[in-house]
Regions:
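Canonical Rossmann dinucleotide-binding motif of NAD(H)/NADP(H)-dependent dehydrogenases/reductases
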Residues: 5-35
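Substrate-binding pocket helix/loop in short-chain dehydrogenase/reductase
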Residues: 90-91, 95-100, 201
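Active-site loop immediately N-terminal to the catalytic Tyr-X3-Lys motif
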Residues: 92, 137-143, 165-166, 208
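Active-site loop-to-helix junction immediately N-terminal to the catalytic Tyr of the SDR YXXXK motif
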Residues: 94, 138-146, 158, 186
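Active-site helix of classical SDR
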Residues: 114, 148
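Alpha-helical segment proximal to the catalytic Tyr-Lys
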Residues: 119, 161-165
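Residue(s) in the substrate-gating loop at a strand-loop-helix junction
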Residues: 132
Length: 222
């Protein structure tokens, strides 16, 4: 396959870079010539041009990260908010701690990162926020997760309207099931074998399989 180099010398910041979608996105961007800064709790196993280990629950870290990435890469053209957590259980089962974690990582962190990135971005820059199909149409027993992803979908629309005149594109990607540790952990919590559960789930998909991280990356890069 031809290496298109669509992102040659573009500077990108990716959150959740140690996860399934995040790590695949880092590889794809670097393959196409981008300079990539990344963050996660531990990024030691991810090859990037700038690694910033940190906790997205830390507001100051989120506020400062885009400028740190810009200084390290000599610019910032792309922000991809990929990091996320999922909390399972109905409203009477989830705790205040789980609420705070979900809102901090899934909503406040992307908000702060977008707010800090936009002033230092030039015309032609892009922001991609990873929401979820459940952010558009809710599913059962995940009120915290679905609420947080709906917030990100709404935030994305607002930012797209507010900053189009600056030539900054803001889009959301809303995946369904993706073969990552997040979905596998859900099967484990329910006492299911993740591999067998995914095999059964694959049978419900017209293509014969759920999405792989690389499928979502293709959409993000578009």
């Amino acid at each position: 396959m031809t290496n298109l180099q669509r992102f040659k010398n573009r500077k990108a910041l990716i959150t959740g870079a140690a996860g399934g979608i995040g790590s695949a996105l880092v590889k794809a961007l670097k393959k196409e010539g981008a300079l990539v800064a990344i963050t996660d709790l531990n990024t030691s196993n991810v090859d990037a041009d700038a690694n910033f280990d940190g906790d997205l629950q830390n507001s100051q870290f989120c506020d400062e990260l885009p400028l740190l990435a810009k200084d390290k890469l000599n610019g910032l053209d792309i922000l991809c908010n990929v990091a996320g957590v999922i909390t399972r259980g109905n409203i009477n089962e989830v705790t205040d701690e789980e609420y705070n974690l979900t809102m901090k990582v899934n909503v406040e962190a992307p908000f702060r990162l977008c707010r800090a990135s936009i002033p230092i971005m030039k015309k032609g820059s892009a922001i991609v926020n990873v929401s979820s199909c459940w952010g558009l149409r809710s599913g059962p027993n995940h009120p915290l997760y679905t609420m947080s992803k709906a917030a990100i979908a709404s935030l994305t629309q607002s930012l797209g309207l507010d900053h189009a005149h600056q030539g900054i594109r803001v889009n959301a990607v809303c995946p369904n099931e993706v073969n990552t540790s997040m979905i596998r952990s859900g099967f484990e919590v329910r006492g299911l074998n993740p591999d067998k559960a995914i095999e059964e789930l694959n049978k419900t998909i017209p293509l014969g399989r759920i999405a792989e991280p690389e499928d979502i990356v293709d959409v993000i890069l578009f």
